[in-house]
Regions:
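C-terminal segments that line or cap access tunnels to active or ligand-binding sites in enzymes
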Residues: 1-209
Length: 209
């Protein structure tokens, strides 16, 4: 685990009120997703995107309008396209797609291996399959019409691991002065983790008490 987990573990040894980090970081088979950025290199994939979105992905306007989930995907694959160009220096003819899978340890529907073992090209092939690209065209499009950079995120859903009261410390534990916890693994009432707002709220509570 990273230095952040080690820091929390060392602090937690001092007092039970400081939480139980091992509840969240001890089993990456239960807390990982895999994310990938697919960038189109020509026009060949775009018609399949347009058929689903009913929008031109290079219009500079809303494209998917949210996340598109492939409900029959063994990987539970989802994808989304934000307004293009997404990056300042992005080529106006290219489209950047965010693809991710929740089940990284099961074989895909087109690529018969787990997502976590796949190359960027293979992830692209699986995505194209769920876009409805004819199977005899998938390999060529993945090879020549897109580039894919995958990223494994081992703790992305650690926030949602089963827990009990006390596994997350209060922002300001009882008796603490000039010491606070902030971020996604602290307790704060009436809010839900996995948002920037949660981190900001806990930081505000830490400052203002």
């Amino acid at each position: 685990t990273s230095g952040c987990w080690s820091l929390w573990k060392n602090i937690a040894k001092q007092d039970p009120a400081f939480g139980h980090p091992e509840k969240f970081c001890s089993d990456i088979t239960k807390t990982n997703w895999e994310s990938a950025t697919v960038t189109t290199l020509d026009d060949k994939i775009l018609p399949y995107i347009e058929k689903i979105c009913q929008r031109d992905p290079r219009s500079g306007k809303t494209v998917t309008g949210g996340i598109v989930s492939c409900k029959d995907s063994s990987w539970l694959l989802s994808w989304t396209i934000n307004r293009q160009g997404q990056f300042k220096e992005q080529d106006k003819d290219k489209v950047c797609v965010w693809v991710y899978g929740l089940f990284t340890d099961v074989p895909g529907d087109f690529i018969k291996k787990p997502m976590k073992e796949c190359t960027g090209k293979e992830i692209t092939e699986e995505w194209l399959y769920h876009l409805g690209v004819p199977e005899d065209q998938i390999e060529d499009l993945a090879e020549h019409s897109a580039v894919c950079v995958p990223t494994m995120m081992p703790y992305i859903t650690a926030f949602f691991m089963p827990r009990t009261k006390g596994d997350r410390p209060d922002v300001i534990p009882d008796g603490c002065v000039n010491f606070a916890f902030l971020g996604q693994f602290t307790e704060t009432p009436r809010d839900t983790v996995f948002t920037t707002e949660y981190s900001v709220r806990t930081a505000m509570e830490a400052v203002y008490g």
